[in-house]
Amino acid sequence: MERCPSLGVTLYALVVVLGLRATPAGGQHYLHIRPAPSDNLPLVDLIEHPDPIFDPKEKDLNETLLRSLLGGHYDPGFMATSPPEDRPGGGGGAAGGAEDLAELDQLLRQRPSGAMPSEIKGLEFSEGLAQGKKQRLSKKLRRKLQMWLWSQTFCPVLYAWNDLGSRFWPRYVKVGSCFSKRSCSVPEGMVCKPSKSVHLTVLRWRCQRRGGQRCGWIPIQYPIISECKCSC
């Protein structure tokens, strides 16, 4: 099994690349720049019977009634009853390339926000001088280096609309994913992976054949990725 690069290797690489020396504040002996590995959260696709006989009819899609059934679980920020304008097209070829560009554009638009991780904020950079003396960098340069490290390990959740099909209401749900097409560590070797998920309550059309076919809407929990972390 391939092991993750050690923290010592990470620090050595920073020294080589930046020509600087980094030491954690408070006399700590180890610098945890990277988050610990997390679960992959395998959110499997739902498998539906292809026979259209199990699809809801037009009379079963009364939006007023369905909104009443869903109640306060309806979240307009993550649910839609009609195709959202920014929903990426499926399929390969040009559509797939356009979707990749849209994903990259969304990634570039996001920047680290909130509180800077303590592991990065606590870094103290010093520049080696003659006779082994050290000199601390200016606050401005130190801040730039910290922001660079933060941006390299930043793992935002990328959201896109997903069509669940006619057997779910609302039919369109905004799902999350982690951008894993580039490494999120220095040196390279780790990628952004799902670390947390939340559940949306949606309605699912279910048919039972016992005593004749009977169908109806039932509430189900639909998981979506809510957090990504830099992991092995």
Curated annotation (Swiss-Prot):
This is Noggin. Changing residue 184 to Y: In SYM1A; sporadic; de novo mutation. InterPro entries: Cystine-knot_cytokine, Noggin. PANTHER family: BONE MORPHOGENETIC PROTEIN INHIBITOR, NOGGIN, NOGGIN. It is linked to Symphalangism, proximal 1A: A disease characterized by the hereditary absence of the proximal interphalangeal joints. Distal interphalangeal joints are less frequently involved and metacarpophalangeal joints are rarely affected whereas carpal bone malformation and fusion are common. In the lower extremities, tarsal bone coalition is common. Conductive hearing loss is seen and is due to fusion of the stapes to the petrous part of the temporal bone. It is found in: Secreted. Residues 1-27 form the signal peptide. GO terms for molecular function: cytokine binding; protein homodimerization activity. Belongs to the noggin family. Glycans are attached at residue 62. GO terms for biological process: atrial cardiac muscle tissue morphogenesis; axial mesoderm development; BMP signaling pathway; cartilage development; cell differentiation in hindbrain; cranial skeletal system development; dorsal/ventral pattern formation; embryonic digit morphogenesis. Homodimer. Interacts with GDF5; inhibits chondrocyte differentiation.
